[in-house]
Amino acid sequence: MSDDILFESKNYFYLGNYQSTINEINKKSRQIIEKSLKAESDYFLYRCYIAQGNYDLVLQETKNNRGSGEDPTIAGLQLLASYLSKPDENREGTLITITQWISDGVVKFNYHLQVIIATIYFNEQLYDEALQILNNCDHIEGLSMLIQIFLKIDRLDLAQKAYDTMKKIIDPDATPALLSLAWINIYNGEEKLKSALSSFEEMAERYGPTPLLLNGQAVCAIGMKRFEKAESLLLESIEKNPKNSDTLANLINCYINMKKPNEIIQRFINQLKTLSPKHDWTSAVNEAEALFEVSKSRFN
């Protein structure tokens, strides 16, 4: 019964519909009585606020989580909120804290904390460290993240293996499994793109379009060279969240292929640089610009 209470909330979370997750948890607050269930709901509630960029709210509401009675998961959420609020400024201290927690054994049996730490490592592009944290994990969110990391480092074989493990834990038609398979199909390319696109479209029709689902559809459309369709999907995503870095990156890619005016493309590149300095697209642009400056200096 406990799992049923949070089922819709978690499903919205996996789909990237963070406000609906928050709304569902708030609506069912009187049913969330058990201590373990309250801890679970708080975890997803604060993850949503963090995803929305409401870092100060999380830090303010959890400020009493200190001392001998400190909840490790809440401490992890505080660390994530603090880190994301000022990544460059808080990077060193965050990584030191994580190292200490790992050394103290705090992380080993706390799968929520494992995901939080892996998220920070992923953001810092420390993929080996993230994989070590999630090594041998057998929980849904951890496996979903493992698949993301394996795809990021071009290990499609290991992503497929993690997906096979996931299918043993949850129904293949459950949202996390459908999302994971769709991304694996995207990386397989060619005919698999059609299957991935259908999956994203079906989820969007069933649960409503979210930036995550719209971006998934757009990536498929770009891969199939259906750039006008991709543009329409990405503009819809921007209307829902103008600060979604993946939407901006995919729109840049789409507009380059559509040969849109340079000033339009550059405007989105500048926006992405400001919002997400560590995004793969930002890093690639910065590297290209640096190489251009080096080449230019040789002729001065």
Swiss-Prot record:
GO terms for molecular function: structural molecule activity. GO terms for cellular component: COPI vesicle coat; Golgi membrane. GO terms for biological process: endoplasmic reticulum to Golgi vesicle-mediated transport; intra-Golgi vesicle-mediated transport; protein transport; retrograde vesicle-mediated transport, Golgi to endoplasmic reticulum. It comes from the Eukaryota. It is a peripheral membrane protein. It is found in: Cytoplasm; Golgi apparatus membrane; Cytoplasmic vesicle, COPI-coated vesicle membrane. It comes from Dictyostelium discoideum (Social amoeba). Belongs to the COPE family. Its main location: cytoplasm. Disulfide bonds: none annotated. InterPro entries: Coatomer_esu, TPR-like_helical_dom_sf. Oligomeric complex that consists of at least the alpha, beta, beta', gamma, delta, epsilon and zeta subunits. The keyword Protein transport applies. Keywords: Cytoplasm, Cytoplasmic vesicle, ER-Golgi transport, Golgi apparatus, Membrane, Protein transport, Transport. The coatomer is a cytosolic protein complex that binds to dilysine motifs and reversibly associates with Golgi non-clathrin-coated vesicles, which further mediate biosynthetic protein transport from the ER, via the Golgi up to the trans Golgi network. The coatomer complex is required for budding from Golgi membranes, and is essential for the retrograde Golgi-to-ER transport of dilysine-tagged proteins. This is Coatomer subunit epsilon.
